[in-house]
């Protein structure tokens, strides 16, 4: 059974939600945008008989309110957040880290800074390297000009109208692998969630800053030299094409035909198997 709890990180003035299930070696899962900890429920159910699975809402997503302006979404701040959560829930042993999408950016930075706390890493459909040609809406979200900020604000507001109908229509076209249940969940947790939408704009303005990915090559090398690492990548991803599956540098790369961007939702059993393989390495 998956248990949820809310924790307050006083040192960061942040409240977040943590989901846990099972006992055993720890699997720590980082969600992407525009998702939250619920992304990992199906994977956790697959693993809970052998592992202690832990995931969290990054600040501003899911049931975590938008953080104060003092939290900048820099890699340094996000590493501090992860460390604070792990301290609060008393995680003291090395973990198997599983990352997706924007969670891969945070996860790569955290893992590289904490190889002694890392047992292995599994990467799925993420951007953790320099030179990625960002899609148009991400570029707009990251644009700090007044006109772009206004367009982004209006666009985010429109996504929540009529129960997120516009969002669901757009997202269904971008992610045809997702069913109506997941589209409804995204509409509720993101399109109708003002905190999550404001957080997205704040986060992408940080991601798009020159030099954000400057040190990622060195980070990846540090991780690959320290622990087992595998990539499991959903093909037919409209956001991050399959050619980037090899960009992280892992020797073991599995491509899932037509699984799309959200492997944790479309192929949780395959992802769980990859995690178990890393645990046995």
Short names for language-model regions:
Residues 2-6, 12, 16-18, 54, ...:
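Flexible "cap/lid" subdomain of the alpha/beta-hydrolase fold that forms the substrate-access gate
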Residues 17-65:
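Conserved HGGG/HGGXW glycine-rich cap/lid loop of the alpha/beta-hydrolase fold
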Residues 25, 35, 42, 105, ...:
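Short alpha-helical
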Residues 31-34, 235, 266:
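Conserved residues at beta->alpha junctions
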Residues 33-36, 100, 125, 272:
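Asparagine-centered polar/low-complexity signal
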Residues 38, 42, 109, 243, ...:
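Generic recognition of short, well-ordered alpha-helical segments
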Residues 272-276, 280:
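Two-component system phosphotransfer/interaction surface
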């Amino acid at each position: 059974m998956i248990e949820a709890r809310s924790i307050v990180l006083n040192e960061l003035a942040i409240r977040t939600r943590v989901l846990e299930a099972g006992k055993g070696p720890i699997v720590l899962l980082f969600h992407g945008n525009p998702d939250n900890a619920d992304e990992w429920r199906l994977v956790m159910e697959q693993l809970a008989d052998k592992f202690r699975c832990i995931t969290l809402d990054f600040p501003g997503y899911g049931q975590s309110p938008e953080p104060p302006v003092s939290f900048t979404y820099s890699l340094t701040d996000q590493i501090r957040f992860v460390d604070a959560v792990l301290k609060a829930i008393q995680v003291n042993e090395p973990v198997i880290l599983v990352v997706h999408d924007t969670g891969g950016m945070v996860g790569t930075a955290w893992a590289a800074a904490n190889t002694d706390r890392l047992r292995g890493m599994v990467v799925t459909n993420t951007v953790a390297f320099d030179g990625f040609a960002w899609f148009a809406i991400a570029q707009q979200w990251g644009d700090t000009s007044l006109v772009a900020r206004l367009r982004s604000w209006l666009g985010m507001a429109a996504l929540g109208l009529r129960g997120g109908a516009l969002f669901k229509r757009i997202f269904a076209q971008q992610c045809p692998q997702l069913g109506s249940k997941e589209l409804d969940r995204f509409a509720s947790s993101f399109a109708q969630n003002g905190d999550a939408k404001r957080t997205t704009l704040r986060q992408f303005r940080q991601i798009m800053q020159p030099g954000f990915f400057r040190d990622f090559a060195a980070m990846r090398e540090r991780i690959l030299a320290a622990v087992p690492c595998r990539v499991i990548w959903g093909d037919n991803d409209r956001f991050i094409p399959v050619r980037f599956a090899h960009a992280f540098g892992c020797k073991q790369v599995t491509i899932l035909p037509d699984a799309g961007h959200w492997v944790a939702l479309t192929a949780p059993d395959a992802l769980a198997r990859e995690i178990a393989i890393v645990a046995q390495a």
